[in-house]
Structure formats: C-alpha cells, structure tokens
C-alpha cells in the first residue's frame, strides 16, 4: 500500500487582538423573592472592562451596553416569520463612550439596573426559551486603519434570573372524604426546591365506624407532577391564517408506591416519607409568561390511598374498597437562601434615620 505524505499547508497568521471586552458582575445571584405582585425585584451591578493591546491608541467611535430580554419559540406557527418565532426587547441602554481616544491599558465603566419583580424568570424547555443577557458593542478605529471604524466588537454576557418563595412555615392540607368519617391531614413544606429533599407527614383519622365496621389501609401512593400549558399566538400578519393551538403537558417528576411503612396508634394512621427531588431531570420551576407567548408551569402533589372496609364478624372480614385521592398545588422554586431581598440589605438613607437621643447634661 503506497504511503500518503501529508503536504505542508500554508497558514495565514491571525491578526493580533487589538482590544478585548469583559464584564464582571459584582452583585449576588439575581433572584426574585416572592410573587410577581409583591417582589421588589433584583438588583444587578457590574463593571464593563475595555483592555487595549498592541496599539499606541484606538479611537472609540461608540461603546454601548444593552440589557436585552429575548423570547424564542422553538416551534413557531410560521417557521419563516421572525415575529412569530419570538421577540426581542431592550430593557436598558448605556452609552458609555463616543469619539474618545484611549491609550493602552484597561478602562472601567460601572453599571447597575433594577430588574422589576413583575418580570418572568429565565426558562428553557422544548417549546420556548426566555433569556436575559448583556450585549456590549464597540466600534473603534486604529492608527493603521486610518482610525476609520472597523468591524464592531460584540460581547454577549448571559444573565440567569430566578424566582424564589419567601420562607414560611409548613402548610397543612386537610381533606374530608364523605360519606365516611375518614379525614387526612398532609403536612408539606411551603415550597420544594430542585435537587433537594423534603419531608411529607400524613395523619389520617376516622377508621373506626359507628356500625362496627373499620377501615384498613392496603396501599399508599404519591407522585409529584409537572403541569405545563403553552400557547403561541401568531403575529398580526398571520393571525387570520393560523389559529393558535394550546398545548397541555403533564409529566411525573417523582413517585413512590408504599405497601407498608405506616403505623396505627389509637385508630390513627401516621406516615412520614421523604420527597426526593434530587433525581429530577431538568425540572422547570414555577413560571408564568403572559401573551402572546403564554406559558404556565405549575406542580401538583397527588396522594392516593386504598382502604378496605372490614367487618367485625367471624368468617367475613373483607368488604368494599375505596380510593382516597388528595391533590394539592405544590410550588417548585429556587432556594431563597437567607430570604433577604436587595432593599432590605441596603443601609438606611439619611431621611430614614430618626433624631438622635438627647444629650446627657
């Protein structure tokens, strides 16, 4: 077999970088505390850096920083229409420099902006993607290029916005199952977190009946479901051609089937089990996006138990059976950390400080 010799290839050296852009965030993670109606927002602050390399100077014609909110529909009604495929909204613009000459070194521009608490959190699934990012655009000229504007340098810095519930005590859900005397009390945390664990406690009473017939538990099942509702409306130009098709999807994130593990004390059933959310694959936290790209993600905990009626008569201790089902809304959000919003961390301003105490004489 003849050998193949590799021929040398001519390579064109790349032009050395004349300048670089960089963004350093100084604020903590962007987390909305509370519902969109009550949240005070999230404060973002950082520094934009411009480093000039291998040039005696550069002439900056424009340096602009924008905060952008972008919605992308992965399966739009009209695939070739950009308006049906999403939207782009500029939330804030900073004009940092214009017609200015800079020598070699690093220049800094601080920036800050308060995200309103009514904005939806970042989300990404197989139907829609909502993202926030910073985009810096630099248009400059170099001495060798006659200080005419060259190809703009663009830096895209993604931001992750999350929403968390304010820490609160556990919630007790009470359900009555007529015509029986059975009553269930389910104690759950106020919110669940992805990749974590939570304790669920169940207490049931009313197993002893007045007619001498008792109820007996055979099986207990619980599952955590994710409900998603999505509807994409076409743009104004295609609204009469295509009708929106709402999509509803349910999937089970975690489940457990128990045939033992509970105990009876004085005709009361006690069950304590753990809801493990660490095995959830790409869970979506609760989020709601308004029209025209409507998305609502919620989570529900379903608790089911099968009870049999047994008669206190010799030779016949099995009777009819019932399935008792409890469905409660169980929020799934990002952990709140210390649960302190940005406005509570700020020191008091001069107007909010009261008068000094009287001096001693």
Swiss-Prot record:
GO biological process, one term: clathrin-dependent endocytosis
Subcellular location: Cytoplasm; Nucleus
A Pfam family: LDB19
Keywords attached to this entry: Cytoplasm, Nucleus, Phosphoprotein
Disulfide bonds: none
Molecular functions per Gene Ontology: cargo adaptor activity; protein-macromolecule adaptor activity; ubiquitin protein ligase binding
Predominant location category: cytoplasm
Residue positions, PTM Phosphothreonine: 12
Signal peptide start and end residues: none
Entry's Gene Ontology cellular component terms: clathrin-coated vesicle; cytoplasm; cytosol; nucleus
InterPro entries tied to this protein: Arrestin-like_C, LDB19_N
Domain of life of the organism encoding this protein: Eukaryota
Designated name of the protein: Uncharacterized protein C18H10.20c
The species this protein was found in: Schizosaccharomyces pombe (strain 972 / ATCC 24843) (Fission yeast)
């Amino acid at each position: 077999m003849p050998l193949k010799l590799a021929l040398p290839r001519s390579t064109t050296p790349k032009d050395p970088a004349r300048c670089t852009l960089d963004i350093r965030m100084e604020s903590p993670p962007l987390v909305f505390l509370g519902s969109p109606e009550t949240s005070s927002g999230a404060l973002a602050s950082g520094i934009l850096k411009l480093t000039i390399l291998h040039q005696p100077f550069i002439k900056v014609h424009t340096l602009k920083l924008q905060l952008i909110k972008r919605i992308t529909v992965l399966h739009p009604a009209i695939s070739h229409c950009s308006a049906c495929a999403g939207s782009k909204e500029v939330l804030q613009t900073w004009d940092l420099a214009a017609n200015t000459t800079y020598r070699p070194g690093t220049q800094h521009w601080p920036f800050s902006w308060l995200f309103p608490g009514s904005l939806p959190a970042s989300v990404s699934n197989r139907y829609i993607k909502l993202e926030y990012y910073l985009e810096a655009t630099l248009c400059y000229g170099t001495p060798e290029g006659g200080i005419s504007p060259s190809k703009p340098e663009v830096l895209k810095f993604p931001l992750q916005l999350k929403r968390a519930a304010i820490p609160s005590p556990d919630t007790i859900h009470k359900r009555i199952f007529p015509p029986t005397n059975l009553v269930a009390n389910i104690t759950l945390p106020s919110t669940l977190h992805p990749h974590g664990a939570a304790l669920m406690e169940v207490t049931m009473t009313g197993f002893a009946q007045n007619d001498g017939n008792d109820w007996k538990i055979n099986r207990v099942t619980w599952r955590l479901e994710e409900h998603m509702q999505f509807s994409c409306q076409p743009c104004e130009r295609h609204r009469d051609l295509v009708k929106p098709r709402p999509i509803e999807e349910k999937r089970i994130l975690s489940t457990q089937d128990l045939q033992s593990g509970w105990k009876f004390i004085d005709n009361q059933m006690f069950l304590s089990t753990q809801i493990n959310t660490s095995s959830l694959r790409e869970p979506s936290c609760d989020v709601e996006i308004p029209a025209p790209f409507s998305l609502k993600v919620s989570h529900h905990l379903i608790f089911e138990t099968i009870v049999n009626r047994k008669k206190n008569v010799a030779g016949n201790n099995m009777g009819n059976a019932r399935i008792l089902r409890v469905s409660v809304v169980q929020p799934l959000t990002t952990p709140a950390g210390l649960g302190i919003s940005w406005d509570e961390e700020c020191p008091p301003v001069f107007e909010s400080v009261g008068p000094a105490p009287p001096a001693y004489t």
